[in-house]
């Protein structure tokens, strides 16, 4: 059986980890980074993911997608989506089923389809490390993700060619990463997870008995549309307002300028975590009839904190609710773990520390802990990790709509999963032959205030006065937190059941079509990779040849030099095209044309060696003081 990998599919950055022996290991991607920006660009020729996508975002803002996780499993008309429509440089549209989709080069795409590109890169990173195909994964989601968002995440995994063995909550994964090597005693841990697009708080009890560890989630709460992106947006809007005051021009109407502003705001926010002041300097940000305009704004840490103060305060209310749900007070919490890049902001750390009245743990990497926890859970599922039991909860209450548009709860929030619950209902009218089961998720009493997950009909109920038929509705939540609902007429035994896919979401046919599309692109991607390799080899050959020509100097006859330069020009022309065979052929011809250069280089080397021999013999008697030349690879520091 192949390895099951652990993936943290983040709003801003994603990360992949795998068990290496019995130790979780975060893997470096092709660029040498341990985290990958969750940015996907469609250039018209190819799909770029991560750092390459980020680099070209300024020149291709309308086809470069970031923070796509904020749209996953959401309806276009949702208030949170409408807020993003106004500020994102790319196009967010309403799909036929009412979902929020995006558009690139006129092609409409579902968020799971776009997120699948990030998952594919994570899959490839793991395959490069393991040297074998990877087909199974544990993927993390915010604890406060609803059923639709969890289902959409599983769809993204399928489109990427992964069987999602388990969906696990991000704070729970972080607690696994923290607690897996701490075998002693019992601990109650608060995991404060403020990532790029989502916020979660989970209260988790870690028990160690006779070498067995139990991670039990006592309560969870959060906001799936609050994160680092919102902090960035406050800064972006501030910069745009300052520019408008000074120049009477609104940069919000210019996608290219907004993309540059976004990059600058993110950079400034990160700098202000260690510096007390920074300057945003963007020359030629736009132009009008009077000429080009430049943006230069100084920002202090205090100014940034004042811009985002209410966002930080917004995270404190869920903390109070989670503690109340767990029936605990602040003094009952033993450790506080911070997860998510936005927790590096000093003001966030101060507020959380003051709320809990204790020092924060500093030994958990906020960018990598979630992926490490996912890899541990993957190890539990594959049997590589023993004596670990994970008891997660459902974040929101689940129920059905009953008479008077009331939500009747069958499963309360913070119930340990997997779980089952059933209740018997009846008809509202005499001789009613069918009932509609409308499944809801949320905490409001009124049905319309909750998230509609889907509905189905139970038909063929025997004629009877209202209140007489006995209809049993059963809810079954699996370990992924995904809901299965059934309704049974107790008298006739007629039953109807569904796995909730949300009232919208992707149909089975759509997911399969996207899987096929992804497989077709895999062939294209492989061909493109071969083309890039051929181009790189050709460029390398031209560079080396030019250097050899310089070194050869007068020793190279002019006719030979002319022949080589003609061959180099042919390579340059071929590299600009898309014909791999033509590039390889011209590279080979350049190698053949350069044979004279090789002869000259060899003769020169032999001559130098002959001169150095006596000197070398004299040196041999001395102690070895030579410095050995070595090539060192740059080890990139952990990024935000």
UniProtKB/Swiss-Prot annotation:
Region annotation (Disordered) ranges: 601-640
Q: Where is the composition biased (Low complexity)?
A: 601-621
Q: Cite the InterPro entries for this sequence.
A: ATPase_NBD (IPR043129), Chaperone_DnaK (IPR012725), Heat_shock_70_CS (IPR018181), HSP70_C_sf (IPR029048), HSP70_peptide-bd_sf (IPR029047), Hsp_70_fam (IPR013126)
Compositionally biased region (Acidic residues): 626-640
List residues, modification Phosphothreonine: 198
Return the Pfam families for the record: HSP70
Gene induction: By stress conditions e.g. heat shock.
Which keywords annotate this record? ATP-binding, Chaperone, Nucleotide-binding, Phosphoprotein, Stress response
- Superkingdom of this entry's organism? Bacteria
Annotated GO molecular function terms are: ATP binding; ATP-dependent protein folding chaperone; unfolded protein binding
Q: Which family does it belong to?
A: Belongs to the heat shock protein 70 family.
HAMAP family in alphabetical order: DnaK
Name the NCBIfam families for this protein: PRK00290.1, prok_dnaK
Protein role: Acts as a chaperone.
Protein name per the record: Chaperone protein DnaK
Q: What does the record give as the organism's lineage?
A: Bacteria, Pseudomonadati, Pseudomonadota, Gammaproteobacteria, Alteromonadales
């Amino acid at each position: 059986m192949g390895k099951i990998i652990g993936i943290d599919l983040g709003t801003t950055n994603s990360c992949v980890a795998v068990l290496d022996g019995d130790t979780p290991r975060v893997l470096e991607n092709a660029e040498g980074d341990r985290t990958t920006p969750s940015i996907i660009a469609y250039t018209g020729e190819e799909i770029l993911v991560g750092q390459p996508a980020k680099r070209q975002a300024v020149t291709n803002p309308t086809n470069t997608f970031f923070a796509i996780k904020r749209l996953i499993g959401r309806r276009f008309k949702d208030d949170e989506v409408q807020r993003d429509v106004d500020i994102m440089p790319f196009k967010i549209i309403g799909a036929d089923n009412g979902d929020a989709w995006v558009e690139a080069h006129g092609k409409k795409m579902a968020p799971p389809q776009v997120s699948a590109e990030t998952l594919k890169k994570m899959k490839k990173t793991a395959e490069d490390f393991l040297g074998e195909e990877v087909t199974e994964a544990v993927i993390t989601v915010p604890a406060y993700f609803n059923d639709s968002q969890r289902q959409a995440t599983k769809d993204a995994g399928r489109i990427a060619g992964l069987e999602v063995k388990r969906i696990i909550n991000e704070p729970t994964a972080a607690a696994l990463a923290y607690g897996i090597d701490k075998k002693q005693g019992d601990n109650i841990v608060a995991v404060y997870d403020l990532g790029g697009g989502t916020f979660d708080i989970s209260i988790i009890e870690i028990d160690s008995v006779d070498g067995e560890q139990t991670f039990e989630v006592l309560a969870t709460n959060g906001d799936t549309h609050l994160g680092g992106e919102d902090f960035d947006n406050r800064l972006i809007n501030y910069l745009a307002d300052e520019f408008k005051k000074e120049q009477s021009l609104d940069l919000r109407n210019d996608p290219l300028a907004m993309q540059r502003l976004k990059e600058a705001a993110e950079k400034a926010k990160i700098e202000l975590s260690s510096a007390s002041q920074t300057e945003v300097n963007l020359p030629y940000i736009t132009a009008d009839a009077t000429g080009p305009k430049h943006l230069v704004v100084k920002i202090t840490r205090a100014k940034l904190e004042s811009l985002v103060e209410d966002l930080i305060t917004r995270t404190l209310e869920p903390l109070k609710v989670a503690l109340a749900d767990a029936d605990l007070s602040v003094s009952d919490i033993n450790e506080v773990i911070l997860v998510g890049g936005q927790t590096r902001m000093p003001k966030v750390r101060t507020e959380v520390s003051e709320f809990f009245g204790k020092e924060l743990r500093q030994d958990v990497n906020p960018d990598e802990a979630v992926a490490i926890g996912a890899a541990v859970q993957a190890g539990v599922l594959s049997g590589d990790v023993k004596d670990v039991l994970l008891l997660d909860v459902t974040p929101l209450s689940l129920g059905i709509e009953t008479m008077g548009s009331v939500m009747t709860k069958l499963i309360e929030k913070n119930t340990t999963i997997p779980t089952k619950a059933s209740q018997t209902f009846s008809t509202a009218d005499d001789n009613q032959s069918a009932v509609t089961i409308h499944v809801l998720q949320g905490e409001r009493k009124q049905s319309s205030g909750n998230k509609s997950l889907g509905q189905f009909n139970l038909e063929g109920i025997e004629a009877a006065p209202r209140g007489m038929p006995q209809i049993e509705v059963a809810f079954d939540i699996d370990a992924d937190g995904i809901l299965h609902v059934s309704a049974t007429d107790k008298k006739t035994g007629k039953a109807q059941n569904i796995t909730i896919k949300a009232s919208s979401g992707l149909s089975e046919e759509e997911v399969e079509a996207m899987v096929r599309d992804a497989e077709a692109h895999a062939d294209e991607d492989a061909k493109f990779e071969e083309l890039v390799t051929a181009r790189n080899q050709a460029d390398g050959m031209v560079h080396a040849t030019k250097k050899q020509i310089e070194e050869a100097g007068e020793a190279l006859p002019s006719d030979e030099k002319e022949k080589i330069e003609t061959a180099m020009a042919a390579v340059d022309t071929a590299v600009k095209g898309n014909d791999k065979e033509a590039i390889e052929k011209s590279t080979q011809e350049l190698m053949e044309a350069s044979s004279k250069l090789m002869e000259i280089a060899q003769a020169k080397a032999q001559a130098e060696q002959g001169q150095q021999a006596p000197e070398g013999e004299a040196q041999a008697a001395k102690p070895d003081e030579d410095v050995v030349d070595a090539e060192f690879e740059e080890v990139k520091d952990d990024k935000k």
